[in-house]
Amino acid sequence: DVSVLILFFNRPKLLAQVFEQVKKARPARLFLYQDGPRGERDMPGIEACRKVVADIDWECEVHHNYQEKNYGCDPSEYMAQKWAFSLSNKCIVLEDDDVPAVSFFGFCKELLDKYEHDTRISMIAGFNNEEITPDITSDYFFATTFSIWGWASWRRVTDQWDEFYTFLDDKENMRQLKNLIHTRRDRKDFIYMCQRHREHGKAYYETIFHASMLFNSGLSIVPTRNMITYLGATADSTHFAGSVHTMPRGY
């Protein structure tokens, strides 16, 4: 009994790899979010993606949110996540380039239930950039950083998100944020990123989520063994600038 949100656009070959793993897990609820076309050139890929996710061969409650206009990566991701968590108290989030191990679904289900009411925990990550973290005997550990390449969380967390970055106008919040960034050796440009994102007038969920975790002293759960194969490490990637050859494998 688990909910899964899948975000996709016009890349059916990548999406098919993700959906193949979802089919093996047979979740009870699927939330399917697709951004709208930028023009006619996007329609073949958009239609092909819809065919991929229409291949549901198990008993499943399905919700569709297919946009008619193009919102872009941001704020689409924020919109999709707020939509899914408005309908489900806890949910796994996958994009079309996050291929999960089948074990990731059971891992999330167990921990979503276990930590549902523990407000110290903000999210469950599937990606471990060390591939296998040494010297840890348990299946997971707690961290103050997190990856968005396959994750799960609760509505209580997304309800804390500040879509309009109002914390930027609060001097005490900013003092605390600067101290946290310094203490944790976090990205020195994080506040600048938040300022730029607000100037753009869009909800960028990465900075919104990160700020929420910082202000609420949130912890992430990270698997000792990586559970996500990230396909987004390609030449046309939106967010990734590294090399596919250095990416850890999903187990």
Language-model regions, residue ranges each:
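An acidic/histidine-cluster motif and surrounding catalytic segment
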Residues: 1-93, 98-251
